[in-house]
Regions:
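Acidic donor-binding loop at a coil-to-helix junction in glycosyltransferase catalytic cores
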Residues: 187-195
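Active-site donor/metal-binding and catalytic loop motifs
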Residues: 140-148, 167, 210-230
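Short beta-strand/loop segment that forms part of the nucleotide-sugar
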Residues: 36-45, 66-69
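Acidic donor-diphosphate engagement hotspot in glycosyltransferases and nucleotidyltransferases
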Residues: 102, 115-122
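Active-site-proximal specificity loops/subdomain of glycosyltransferases
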Residues: 50-99
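Conserved donor NDP-sugar-binding/catalytic core segment of glycosyltransferases
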Residues: 121-149
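Short, acidic, metal-binding catalytic loop of nucleotide-sugar glycosyltransferases
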Residues: 23-35
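Short beta-strand-to-loop acidic/aromatic patch adjacent to the donor-nucleotide binding site
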Residues: 103-112
Length: 230
């Protein structure tokens, strides 16, 4: 199973994200499932040499990297408005490039999150077994909250109940992208929550189900590079 991984990123002025991003990319390079390609998009990462240095953490045959010339959302918004829109444009650039290169299934990974080495292997195996178009593992905090103890549980994504870095979607099937909710809908609402809502609607309409793998394979780094929720 070929899997694309979309990672939007930017550089904080104090430079602290460099080490978080490095850890994130190292967690990808350590995956037991190796049939993947990373699409790393800099949202005007303002130190291009550093951006290229980070890109080299991944095998050159397994990465497409592009540093955008403009910080799209960060040039327009701040505070909550930036929090709900940040990375939308960069993510969609990565999704479009992955589709152009023939990938159907695209996994998301934020630049301050980590995957356990078996994350992609579990994702790939579950897709092969279920033929689902949406798959998620559990996060370290237990999301999504589920009562089922089965290893694979039928489920449809819900806003605020999904960690983006646990998900993998068939974007060719859903034909969907992140929306800038402020510009496109005139609502200050998180773009990823909006995406899960629209995926849910499509799945209900088509009478299809996604699945959750009942295993935690994702963790988040805090500003001191300590895992917060493994």
């Amino acid at each position: 199973m070929k899997l694309a991984i979309v990672i939007p990123t930017y550089r904080k002025r104090n430079g602290e994200y460099k080490y978080q991003i490095a850890k994130t990319l190292e967690s990808v390079s350590n995956q037991t499932h190796t049939d993947y390609k990373v699409f790393l998009i800099g949202d005007l990462y303002d130190d291009n040499d550093e951006f290229e240095e980070l890109s080299r953490i991944i095998d050159p045959s397994k990465i497409w990297s592009h540093n955008l010339p403009i910080a799209y959302e960060r040039s327009k918004y701040s505070g909550k408005e930036l929090w709900v829109t940040g990375g939308v444009y960069a993510s969609n650039i990565g999704i479009d490039q992955a589709l152009k290169e023939g990938f159907d299934y695209i996994c998301h990974l934020d630049h301050d999150d980590l995957w356990k080495p078996n994350h992609l292997e579990l994702i790939s195996t579950a897709i092969d077994e279920t033929k689902t178009n949406f798959i998620s593992t559990r996060s370290g905090k237990g999301w999504p909250v589920m009562e089922s103890t089965e290893y694979l549980t039928k489920w449809r994504p819900l806003p605020s109940k999904v960690f983006k870095s646990t998900t993998c979607l068939n974007y060719k099937h859903f034909n969907i992208r992140f929306r800038n909710m402020i510009e496109e809908v005139n609502i200050v609402y998180a773009s990823d929550a909006d995406l899960w809502h629209r995926v849910n609607q499509l799945m209900v309409k088509n009478n299809e189900w996604g699945y959750v793998i009942n295993e935690s394979t994702m963790a988040r780094l805090d500003s001191q590079f300590v895992i917060k929720n493994n």
